[in-house]
Regions:
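N-terminal amphipathic/basic-hydrophobic helices that include classical n-h-c signal peptides
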Residues: 1-22
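Conserved, structured core segments of small domains
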Residues: 23-134
Length: 134
């Protein structure tokens, strides 16, 4: 693993060599999904993740659109920051919405991979991400 500081990380183990990824990637959880992860220590994801065969994540620049598209109007959500370097070779960057590359984990997410998790409040009909969200 090669790490380049400047709010990004170059990780040779994931995808093509030199692919720049953020140090942190993000997962939006419903309350019961977050509670289950805390209780069991790992998850295979939400129903959509199980259907697709991988756990969906977003970068910081993709997360608001993900919230708007998949969680519009939903309350009791949490956003978790995941250290991408802890996920190993199961993390793949794949083209998805609008031709953008999204991080997908082929495997389980462990609670030890979570750097922090905070409530994602609904403010005036839109989810408001925390200040520490980078």
């Amino acid at each position: 693993v090669t790490i380049t500081w400047n709010n990004t990380t170059t990780v040779d183990d994931f995808g093509s060599a030199g692919h720049r990824l953020p140090m942190l990637i993000y997962k939006i959880f419903r309350f019961h999904e977050w509670e289950q992860l805390k209780t069991t220590g790992q998850t295979s994801g939400a129903p959509i993740d199980l259907d697709d065969g991988y756990i969906h994540f977003s970068t910081s620049s993709q997360a608001q659109e993900t919230a708007d598209k998949h969680f519009a109007g939903a309350e009791n959500l949490y956003v978790a920051a995941i250290d991408a370097t802890k996920l190993g070779t199961g993390l793949k960057w794949e083209v998805s919405r609008g031709g953008a590359e999204f991080p997908h984990l082929y495997g389980k997410l462990n609670i030890t991979d979570v750097e922090w998790c905070l409530p994602l409040p609904l403010v005036k009909g839109r989810h408001e991400f925390p200040e520490k969200f980078i």
